[in-house]
Amino acid sequence: MDLLCTRPGCARLNSFPDLDNRNTLQTVQQRFCTSCRMPLILAGRYLPVKLLGQGGFGAAYLALDRFTPTMRFCVVKQFQPSGNLNQEQLDLALSLFEREAVVLEKLGNRHDQIPDLFAYFPLLVDDPRTGKQDQFFYLVQEFINGQDLEKTVEKHGPLSEAEVRWVLTEMLKILSFVHGTGAIHRDIKPSNLMRDQEGKLYLLDFGAVKQATAGVGASNEGSTGIYSMGFAPPEQMAGNQVYPATDLYALAVTCLYLLTGKTAQDLYDAYHNQWNWRSPGLKVSQPLADVIDRLLLPTPKDRYASAEEVLAVLNGGKGNQGKAPPGATVSTPQGTNTQIQPTPASSASPLTAPKTPGKISQAVQNLPVLKVLFQGALTGSALVFWGIIAVSLFPQTNISLGILGMVVAGIILAQFKRWLEVTEMLSLNTLTILALLAVPGLSRWPKIVELATQLDFPVLVTVIIAAIAGAIAVVATIALFLLILKLLFAVLTRV
């Protein structure tokens, strides 16, 4: 199994073949990065296996929870600020990270379309490079196995009106719950909406959530400058109070992206200070267009007041204030996009999580195929080199086979213990070739000499050709084995 180091600036991939054994995986105390000595098993149970995404203030990893019956996947988010931030900015960023954990604990376990919180913890570790102690913060949440809607549009193009209407309806139901708890999400956008393998829609990334405590769902404090360019309404960009209607505005812009595949900058007419999204080629029913137009109005009080009201209109009701006029205007979206957290899984391509992850499934999913094949090629060539040397020095079959067997066992053991990796194998093969070049007697196996004579090649060139053939044979064998293993795994997970 390969484990990623989460220390900023390291990110080394560490291989531990013994962790493919389920019993070892669940009983081992700790493993450390071979480069910086960072603990790899976070909080004693979470094993990072893949980087999902990285933003200005955090990184997200796909991880295994080794203390669950199915070895379930989860998302581990690390507070990882970058750039030149002053102490006030760092404190704000950390408070937002902690707030996401609090919100997920409060909301996730109560709504099945919001990820659950599994853990939140600090980690104090020594840095051998500086001699100082570093502190890191981690948040562990449910892994949603799917694709965010931004990537869906990038890959497949705009959605149909029926699909967009479904997304809008599902999101309104989720926001009705969120707003009902007194929270405002403040970062609704396509990359924070994810559809899983079964088609269920989820709302992600609660790092920008703000509690609404005054007025009609309004915050009694100013809003921090945290938003995504093009999706935030004027009141949010100005740092003013935020409302449920703030999220509804961002949801409307999200719907425009899903319908057209175009960004807000492409659909907003800055010269006339209005949205210009209704193109002749875009077929959208008048009722849906009217709902979107009203949600895009610049003043919060002119939009729908709640998600429930929008749902009522979509279901045939009239709402409280009638329809918004076509071509509704709004202030030019300006400001800086300060994205606090990466979307947990939006940066990753859809993964097919096994139904019952275990020793075999994890070995298959986490196997670095190219590295295995390359190391197999180096091993195959090394075995040919040493086989020729053994037979050349000891023509007696039993002795040469014994020596070759010991060499094979030694190489396998050294690779298992990670004493010999790609770099070391390259060095070993290079030194072997130099030895063959310096000592001709090491390559005087009669069959090699005979083959060199037939090919009219120097003996050393013939030896290298034989080594290449051995490398190809090993690579082909490994590739066939991996193919069979993956096919077998695919069949078993569908039973």
Curated annotation (Swiss-Prot):
For this record, the Gene Ontology CC terms, alphabetical, are:
cytoplasm
User: Which residue intervals make up region (Disordered)?
Assistant: 316-354
Which keywords annotate this record? ATP-binding, Kinase, Nucleotide-binding, Serine/threonine-protein kinase, Transferase
Q: Name one Pfam family in it.
A: Pkinase
Give the Gene Ontology MF terms in alphabetical order.
ATP binding; protein serine kinase activity; protein serine/threonine kinase activity
Q: Which reaction does it catalyse?
A: L-seryl-[protein] + ATP = O-phospho-L-seryl-[protein] + ADP + H(+); L-threonyl-[protein] + ATP = O-phospho-L-threonyl-[protein] + ADP + H(+)
Q: Which sites bind ATP?
A: 52-60, 77
Q: What is its EC number?
A: 2.7.11.1
Protein kinase domain residues are 46-314
Does the record's keyword annotation contain Transferase?
A: yes
Q: Where is the signal peptide?
A: none
Q: What class of enzyme is it?
A: transferase
Polar residues composition bias: residue spans: 329-350
Q: Does the keyword Kinase apply?
A: yes
InterPro entries found in the cross-reference section = Kinase-like_dom_sf, Prot_kinase_dom, Protein_kinase_ATP_BS
Q: Which residues form the active site?
A: 187 (proton acceptor)
**Which PANTHER family does the record associate with it?**
SERINE/THREONINE PROTEIN KINASE (PTHR24363), SERINE_THREONINE KINASE LIKE DOMAIN CONTAINING 1 (PTHR24363:SF0)
Please give the family membership noted in the entry: Belongs to the protein kinase superfamily. Ser/Thr protein kinase family.
NCBIfam families per the record? 4Cys_prefix_kin
* Name of the molecule in the record: Serine/threonine-protein kinase F
